[in-house]
Amino acid sequence: MTLRAATAFFAVGFVLHHLDHLRRGYGVVEEGVIAGRTVAAMLVAVLFTLVVTRHHTAPIAAVVVGGAVLVGVVTVRLVPPFGPPSDHLGAEGTEVWSWLAVGIELVGAVVLVLAGWRALRPTPA
């Protein structure tokens, strides 16, 4: 998968996860989660710009941003609550939509990291 296609796939997952937060309402989400999501959104915007403009740092940005989002989402959503920030998917009443949105974002982050890593490898002569 090309870096552009991987970025588009990741962006879909990122937006779906964000829409899930909007659907659930920000009153149920801790401030630390909102702050982390805001930082992630800024990084994703920079990444998107780098990829669309075919900037030479786009592959590195894909690995870094994809990896950071992957670690952040796993820590906040999948690891049992250990303190703020946490928005654990295992909580009672978690809906299928939330699982789906997070799952698509996580798969997109893995695809993004792999595409960035692949783009960093030298092409055979």
Residues covered by each model-derived region:
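Transmembrane alpha-helix entry/boundary detector in multi-pass membrane proteins
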Residues: H17-L43
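Interfacial non-cytosolic loop connecting adjacent transmembrane helices
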Residues: R24-G32, T75-L100
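Alpha-helical transmembrane segments in multipass membrane proteins, preferentially the mid-helix core
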Residues: M42-T53, V113-W117
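Alpha-helical transmembrane segments
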Residues: T2-L16
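Membrane-water interface at the C-terminal end of transmembrane alpha helices
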Residues: M1-T2, L100-A125
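Loop-to-transmembrane helix junctions at the membrane interface
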Residues: T49-V74
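C-terminal TM-helix exit segments that contain a strictly Trp-centered aromatic cap at the helix terminus
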Residues: V12-R24, G67-G83
